[in-house]
């Protein structure tokens, strides 16, 4: 029922609309007949309602289409009019202007043509068939001809510059290709060596150091190899310097450049001083084997810690700190004073070594020989002790053992300073008797003897190293220690004849320098050395082992005896000046 009712309502509305349309059509056809006399022969009452509806709808669409098309055409025409207004003005312009307006027209058109020429050069003005515009064409042609002439000239210049650039680039490429051939540069012309700013700065620093001071410092740290300077290297003007600035390298450059004008003996002097500093204060003690040059026989162990020299006070001439000054820090006194530097005494190796260097030396020795303490200690080495001695190692640790050790050290400092004064007086006496140079034959003989007795020399080195670490508590052990000192100094100092003159009577003297003294010993050598060491020395070593058991480092007890008074230093300097 709902569907039928909806369709019925539609049909009713369509019939009503068609009835109205019929009325309108009939009215329109009657109007055409009466007014215009047109008879179309249409009778709207005969056609059904749906035909009238469809016809009217089609006519309405057609009218809408026509209206839209007309509107679009009108809009397009309006746009075209907006785009081209000057053409209409030219078309609407009067064909024959009056003669009064010619001047104004000329001015206006000349301005317009100038503007056009600026904007569009290739366009030609339109004369419009006028005879008056002839001079204007001439005026316009002149700037065009000028610009046309200028344009080809600039083009030619640009082409030439481009060609030149191309040629230069091609030449540069050819040169680069030839230089890159096989990765080798072509050797043509004179090569110039360019010095960088960094090298110039380093050279200025070297020159400044040469003018300010002319002597080496007492120690050259960081160098472990023996340096020998030949006469050819000394005569050269400059030495190659690496990129890194090492302290030792700068000292070497200073020392070598000071002896540029020297002779052959100056080369011996430089090499011997360098060898001495390296073997005494450098890192050479930590190496297993140190090769000494033949020039070391003339040099002395003059930079030994002063405390160790003070222990051997009964025989001051046997320990060769005094003989180390005979050559005055390794200097050759046969040279002229003009060849020397004025302030050569500053920073020399004969001055007392600071506590830091001696402590480092002691720690190096103890680090390389850890088994000596176990062998010489009282608790572990009872079998190696002297059976004739009265002393025995305590079974328990004493609480006040370290304090007694320090008190004995403080008491032993007072006689040491007096004995060092006596050694300085003997030093002045012995300096005049020693000769300045030795022959090569004696050196060779000493080398041969030293090779035969290298084993005894190793044991003596061991004795000296351990004796420097241990404090002296009793006066009974001093004579035997002094004998051991004399044996040690004979191995590293001048020939035996000089030492016999300066020392108190010693029965046996072992031969001098060993060619290659080894610092670190094997276990077999350490066993042999323990049997060859004097018994009293072993006795004095036992308190030291107990002190180590009480966790007291050796540097604390040793550093107290390393200090020297300024009076002793002044006396040593006076002795050097007098010689």
UniProtKB/Swiss-Prot annotation:
Its main location: endoplasmic reticulum. Residues 108-126, 421-431, 449-470 have a biased composition (Basic and acidic residues). Residues 378-440 are annotated as: Lung-homing for mammary tumors. It comes from the Eukaryota. One of its GO terms (biological process) is positive regulation of autophagy. In the mammary gland, expressed at the apical surface of epithelial cells lining ducts, as well as in the mammary fat pad. Not detected in the spleen, kidney, lung, or skin; minute amounts seen in the liver. Expressed in Purkinje neurons in the early postnatal and adult cerebellum. Overexpressed in mammary tumors (at protein level). The modification Phosphoserine is found at residues 179, 215, 250, 297, 303, 308, 341, 366, 412, 423, 454, 475, 491, 493, 565. Residues 78-222, 277-579 are annotated as: Disordered. Residues 1-48 are lumenal. It holds the Pfam family LYRIC. Keywords: Acetylation, Cell junction, Cytoplasm, Endoplasmic reticulum, Membrane, Nucleus, Phosphoprotein, Tight junction, Transmembrane, Transmembrane helix. Residues 317-329, 351-369, 380-391, 410-420, 517-533, 546-565 have a biased composition (Polar residues). InterPro entries: LYRIC, TransReg_TumorExp. Residues 159-168, 197-207, 438-448, 568-579 have a biased composition (Basic residues). The modification N6-acetyllysine is found at residue 263. Down-regulates SLC1A2/EAAT2 promoter activity when expressed ectopically. Activates the nuclear factor kappa-B (NF-kappa-B) transcription factor. Promotes anchorage-independent growth of immortalized melanocytes and astrocytes which is a key component in tumor cell expansion. Promotes lung metastasis and also has an effect on bone and brain metastasis, possibly by enhancing the seeding of tumor cells to the target organ endothelium. Induces chemoresistance. Interacts with BCCIP, CREBBP/CBP and RELA/p65. This is Protein LYRIC. The gene is Mtdh.
